[in-house]
């Protein structure tokens, strides 16, 4: 069943009854995305919060010079969304591109709010998930300011070997905030 991974993900944070889980998962809909296709592009309004069942996504922005800067990756068993666009219903600054054929479960804002109203523990679930996401972002910011590009590169490939194996050097460089040529130099020296 496609919802098994979602159920496992949410129940590691908050306990739900079987009935609650059925109602929770019924509000998600499945979407398949082919490699290199976009789930969201800059300028669109993000109308979903997503959970990755299969595959991997790169979430990135395009700067004024046309460079792609990767903010994060979302692999199997990870959540993805543009929280600013989703919550405020404003155009997104983000692009979400599948790095391989992928499948996601999506929930729209209206249904998510209905879950909050129906099951107060859903708010607790998403609060816990938001706190974990903030911790992750804080660690990433600290690493970006505390470590050299070489240290960040080795930390990334050590922590996320499965994701790193799916990426081009240009995509890794965009995530690390360095030029592709500099990453090539780091790899040659290692």
State each model region's role.
Residues 70-127:
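Cyclic-nucleotide recognition modules
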Residues 1-29:
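Cyclic nucleotide-binding regulatory module and flanking cytosolic helices
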Residues 30-31, 47-52, 71-72, 175:
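His/acidic/aromatic-lined binding-pocket segments of jelly-roll/cupin-type domains
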Residues 6, 133-142:
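Short, Lys/Arg-enriched N-terminal segment that forms or immediately precedes the first helix
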Residues 63-70:
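Hydrophobic/aromatic-rich structural module bridging two neighboring secondary-structure elements via a short loop
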Residues 36, 47-59, 76-77:
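Glycine- and acidic-residue-biased ligand/ion/polar-headgroup-sensing regions
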Residues 39-44:
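Short phosphate-coordinating micro-motif centered on Lys-Gly-acidic
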Residues 147-190:
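Phosphate-/nucleic-acid-contacting segments
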């Amino acid at each position: 069943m496609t919802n098994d991974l979602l159920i496992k993900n949410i129940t590691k944070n908050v306990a739900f009854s079987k009935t609650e889980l059925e109602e929770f998962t019924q509000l998600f809909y499945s979407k398949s995305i082919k490699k290199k296709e976009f789930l969201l592009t800059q300028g669109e309004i993000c109308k979903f919060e997503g959970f990755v069942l299969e595959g991997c996504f790169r979430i990135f922005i395009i700067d004024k010079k046309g460079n792609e800067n990767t903010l994060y990756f979302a692999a199997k068993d990870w959540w993805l969304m543009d929280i600013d666009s989703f919550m405020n219903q404003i155009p997104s600054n983000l692009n979400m591109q599948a790095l391989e054929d992928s499948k996601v479960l999506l929930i729209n804002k209206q249904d998510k709010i209905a879950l909050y109203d129906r099951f107060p523990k859903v708010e607790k679930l998403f609060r816990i998930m938001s706190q974990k996401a903030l911790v992750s972002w804080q660690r990433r910011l600290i690493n970006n300011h505390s470590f050299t590009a070489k240290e960040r590169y080795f930390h990334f490939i050590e922590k996320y070997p499965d994701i790193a194996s799916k990426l081009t050097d240009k995509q890794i460089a965009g995530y690390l905030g360095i030029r592709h040529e500099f990453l090539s130099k780091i790899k040659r020296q290692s």
